[in-house]
């Protein structure tokens, strides 16, 4: 896998770092750690929305050198929370995020994959929390989907599983896996350690803005490292062939 983004001594006030790491094309990287660990701060910095100490290079160039419009063609970012902007149909909201507005087939395909096919005519301000979250996810997927955007490279997601039920989480995992196979790098924050253990290629474990461990998921999500991050004892068991983490009291 080729390196897509390099972070060196990235820090932001007392909330983050300094930390260094790399993101490769076609990999799924999970940011894990307790509340206040700095996951959202790091994602916003990687998206180019904030500034601070250290340096980030994206696609071989300093992140701050990218023009905003050009950067939006290469990376998409889902914030943790966002209210509907104003009343508009779901299909209209999704179209605003498409680089090629004529590709209605791509819009319908992504909407169907996320269970939104029957909601395209609904107004975004009349959706449930879970429905709105899936609309937001569909929008950022369409923004960098390789079938419609040949320069899409990076998808940054802040707690994308919020408000999704088990079936909807599974549907999102399938979409992300498809993007990963197409070469898109995905960086997302997660509070579900077992989900990370099954679906991430790599993980960064943070606590109070510091990077405790980074690397392959099974090397990072160990009882020893997790105890440092969460102050709890953990055990890793094998359940029907799947490694599973439980907190040990």
Swiss-Prot record:
Keywords: ATP-binding, Cell inner membrane, Cell membrane, Membrane, Nucleotide-binding, Translocase, Transport. GO terms for molecular function: ABC-type vitamin B12 transporter activity; ATP binding; ATP hydrolysis activity. It is found in: Cell inner membrane. CDD domains: ABC_Iron-Siderophores_B12_Hemin (cd03214). ATP binds at residues 33-40. The complex is composed of two ATP-binding proteins (BtuD), two transmembrane proteins (BtuC) and a solute-binding protein (BtuF). This is Vitamin B12 import ATP-binding protein BtuD. It comes from Salmonella enteritidis PT4 (strain P125109).
């Amino acid at each position: 896998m080729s390196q897509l983004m390099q972070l060196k001594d990235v820090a932001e006030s007392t909330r983050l770092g300094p930390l260094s790491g790399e993101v490769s094309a076609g990999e799924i990287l999970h940011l894990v750690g307790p509340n206040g660990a700095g996951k959202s701060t790091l994602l916003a910095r990687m998206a180019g929305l904030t500034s601070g100490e250290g340096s980030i290079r994206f696609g071989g160039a300093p992140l701050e050198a990218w023009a905003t419009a050009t950067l939006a063609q290469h990376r998409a970012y889902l914030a943790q929370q966002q209210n509907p902007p104003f009343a508009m149909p779901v299909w209209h909201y999704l179209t605003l995020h498409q680089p090629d507005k004529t590709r209605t087939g791509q819009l319908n395909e992504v909407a169907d994959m996320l269970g939104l096919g029957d909601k395209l005519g609904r107004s975004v301000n009349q959706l449930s929390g879970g429905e709105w979250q899936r609309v937001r996810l569909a929008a950022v997927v369409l923004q960098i989907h390789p079938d419609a955007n040949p320069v899409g490279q990076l998808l940054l997601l802040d707690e994308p599983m919020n408000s999704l039920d088990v079936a909807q989480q599974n549907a999102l995992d399938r979409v992300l896996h498809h993007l990963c196979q197409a070469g898109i790098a995905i960086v997302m924050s997660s509070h579900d350690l077992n989900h990370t253990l099954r679906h991430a290629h790599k993980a960064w474990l943070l606590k109070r803005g510091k990077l405790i461990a980074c690397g392959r998921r099974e090397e990072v999500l160990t009882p020893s490292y997790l105890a440092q991050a969460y102050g709890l004892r953990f055990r890793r068991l094998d359940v029907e062939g799947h490694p599973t983490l439980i907190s040990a009291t």
